Amino acid sequence: VAVGFVRPARPDDAGEIARIQLATWRVAYRRVLPKHVLDEIDEAFLALRWTDAVTAPPTARHRVLVAVEQNAVEQAVQEYVVGFAASGPFDDGALAADEDHTPDRENVAAVTDMLVEPRWGRRGHGSRLLAASVDLWRGDGFDSAVCWAFDADAATRKFLTSAGWAPDGATRALDVDDLLIPQLRLHTTL
């Protein structure tokens, strides 16, 4: 019997978070990002960054959560980290190129990453990550949230819009190896 749940990330999850991030990007974004860019991403470097995010977040409202699938196999319990979500207060990284940082955004959460490894998809892990994140955001005093998605990432856009998110009109282009990749920002009220 498989059971799925979400918990705060622990330092020993950092390597698995990095592996999931890289594996997911290489599948989900292979038509969005240049292959050589995806091939050159250093998983060990990502793991160090995730260790920092888990052990030394910039504020108490920065969070990293992991989705876990737990299976009982022959009287033993096996747990697999299958996805993760990272978020924090709205900051300059959540701005569009033509926006100024304004103080009225202090109650806005910003999703920096939310990924489920494709082989674990369609089992409710993304929905559990999003629901757990929303619960924490509300507890932290946020009243809305934003998330950037690649224009070409129909799966993420569909997932978020099915959960009540909508584009807020902000756009930007991510510069990857001199290739401008369009993104749009989605938002929701909590």
Residue map of PLM features:
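Extreme N-terminal starter segment of soluble prokaryotic enzymes
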Residues: A2-F5
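Short hydrophobic/aromatic beta-strand or adjacent loop that forms the aromatic wall/cage
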Residues: H62-V64, L180-R185
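Glycine-rich phosphate-binding loop
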Residues: G124
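Short glycine/proline-centered loop/turn elements that form peptide/ligand docking sites
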Residues: L130, D153-T156, D175-L179
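Conserved GNAT acetyl-CoA-binding A-motif
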Residues: W137-A149
